[in-house]
Amino acid sequence: MEYKSPVRSNLEQTADPNHVLVNMGPSHPATHGTIQIIAALDGERVAKADIHCGYLHRGFEKESEHHTYHKIIPFTDRLNYCSALNNNFAYVEGVEKLLGIELTPRCIYLRTLLAEYNRVADHVTCVAATVMEMGAMTAFLYLMTIRDYIFEHLNQLTGARLTYSFARVGGLKNDLPDGWLERLEEILQFTEKYCGRIHGLLDRNRIFIDRTRDVGAMSPEHALNWGYTGPILRSTGAKIDIRKDNPYLAYADLDFEVPVGIKGDNYDRYYVRMREIDESISMVRQCMKKLPDGPVNIDDRRIMYPTKDKVYTKIEYLISHFKLVIDGIQVPAGEIYVSHEAPNGELGFYLISDGSGRPYKLHVRSPSFAHMGGMHTLLEGYQVADVIATFGSMNMIGGECDR
């Protein structure tokens, strides 16, 4: 018996017999991860599309049930690995709320600063990949230079370029090193300068406008019906942002605008992300000015790991460290949902504790998964060449989508 892929045969049953079925992915240089797009083509036009994800599923949620709360932090890095700090902070806030602990003022502002700084890196990566696939190599190199500077700078703070594992339940891994804020201001100025060049290269570029304006367009109602959030939803004109609507960390104390688009097309998604870079830079500077003195971690040996000098010299701290590593934090029984405005949209963690040192259940509301659910509607009716540009503007991250 001839084997037929159930994925492909499903579309074959509903597609016009005169259409040509084309596979894009799951191994394709433009898919930014393992995702499969099956397109039924009528000439150069996409008549029907079917999106299939799950090829990068690693069992994040099930694995979390067998690890202590601190040991899950590195797993969250591997969701959206372009902005791992945002994943870290959303997850640990859920644990902190179940514990009922209050962060130090310095920790709150540092988390806000780092979340926005990482947002800049995520947005420049998305725009760079999208414009590169449309042939704008100069803009791509400018944006990747910004990204590299940010990642090297975060490496000085965290010890890693991408997967930081920097958050801790009750604080952060460490405070800022000497000279880090001074270098931060230099990179912000460099980013503003090079983003200005990007606007000059692309905003009124005839080729770029033809490839993006009125391509992959949607209404606010359509976006909300499919569960879109973040820059993709705001590109339609919907002014919805968790940082404004339900402030967390220090966002209630910051002055910032929520950029929105008009048509919800590829151009508006580019525009919203570029404007959000400006707003994030402004918020980082506000956090730098308002950054209070004091400790970054709470003083509670039941939650925080003791410093190494204490572990190696005092038996009570060694015992405390041992208990946290083996048994984990004893989180009171309960359940909570925490959502943050991640670079891709609403990143939520639904956490259930049974009172032990390991979560009973941890579910992730990943924005990329919701976005892929309705992406076929943005591809159908457009050209084959538009598939790559539209897919790039959605910024699907495989680790976040498939978990």
From Swiss-Prot:
Q: Which Pfam families match?
A: Complex1_49kDa
Q: Which InterPro entries match?
A: NADH_Q_OxRdtase_suD, NDH1_su_D/H, NiFe-Hase_large
The protein's location, in the record's own words, is: Cell inner membrane
EC number(s) reported in the record: 7.1.1.-
- What Gene3D superfamilies would the database entry show? Cytochrome-c3 Hydrogenase, chain B
Tell me the keywords, alphabetical order: Cell inner membrane, Cell membrane, Membrane, NAD, Quinone, Translocase, Transport, Ubiquinone
Q: How does it sit in the membrane?
A: Peripheral membrane protein
Care to name a GO molecular-function term for this sequence? quinone binding
Fetch the SUPFAM superfamilies from UniProt.
Answer: HydB/Nqo4-like
What is this enzyme's catalytic activity, as reactions? Answer: a quinone + NADH + 5 H(+)(in) = a quinol + NAD(+) + 4 H(+)(out)
Q: Where is the signal peptide?
A: none
Q: What does this protein do?
A: NDH-1 shuttles electrons from NADH, via FMN and iron-sulfur (Fe-S) centers, to quinones in the respiratory chain. The immediate electron acceptor for the enzyme in this species is believed to be ubiquinone. Couples the redox reaction to proton translocation (for every two electrons transferred, four hydrogen ions are translocated across the cytoplasmic membrane), and thus conserves the redox energy in a proton gradient.
**UniProt record similarity statement:** Belongs to the complex I 49 kDa subunit family.
**Which NCBIfam families does the record cross-reference, listed alphabetically?**
NuoD, PRK06075.1
What is said about its interaction partners and assembly? Answer: NDH-1 is composed of 14 different subunits. Subunits NuoB, C, D, E, F, and G constitute the peripheral sector of the complex.
Protein's UniProt name: NADH-quinone oxidoreductase subunit D
